Amino acid sequence: TLSTGLIGCNNEKKQQQTTTQVETTENKVKNNIEFKSDGEPVKDDSVLGKNTYVFSPTDNKDEIQEKVSQIFARQESNQFGDERYALLFKPGDYGTSLEINVGFYTQVLGLGILPTDTNINKLWVNADWMFHNATCNFWRSAENFSVNDYCMWANSQAVSLRRVNFNDGIVLSDGEGWSSGGFMADCKVEKMVSSGSQQQYLFRNNNWGYFENGVWNMVF
């Protein structure tokens, strides 16, 4: 009985500690996102990690573009680097000029409840740095927002598109260059999905206008 009682006390103490930790973390996240982090890295990197940027529709669009472009310039060919970036966008419309090029080790994420809550003009991944060979484009993702313009997402493995609405079409390779593998889930594409040279692609629970150019190993 004594042993059981001690276990019960310990469990209660652990539960109280866990509850306190959760509340503290929630407050940190709330304070960082609401008051400190628009267009700059989140100050307390113990919450969301280093190099986390939270943007708002009220931020200067040119400054957002400048920051996004600076990050891409670092990460476009940085396949063996140790930098990691997260670009978080609060709900709203980011205008008709913002273009997000996504490099290595970069996540782009909309913070709305629905993908339609956050609207970004253009999402783009090419393989210019490797002479259009996208088989070396790894380690990046995009989730939970809408894209107005036509999209190139030329990657190969260790990449994902989740809950993205494309108001135009999307191509999954860069011209005649090679590409091999990827994952798309819960996405809506109003027009065409062109797989191009892609192979070994997994598609789950998507809605498209139509699909073109399957090579092999496509799983739907």
Functional labels for PLM-detected ranges:
Residues 10-12:
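Bacterial signal peptide processing site
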Residues 109, 132-150, 157-166:
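Parallel beta-helix/beta-solenoid
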Residues 59, 93-94, 112, 124, ...:
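Residues at the loop-to-beta-strand transition
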Residues 53, 57-107, 113-116, 123-125:
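N-terminal extracellular ligand-recognition/capping segment immediately after the signal peptide
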Residues 90, 109-111, 121, 145-148, ...:
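Feature marks extracellular polysaccharide-active and adherence modules
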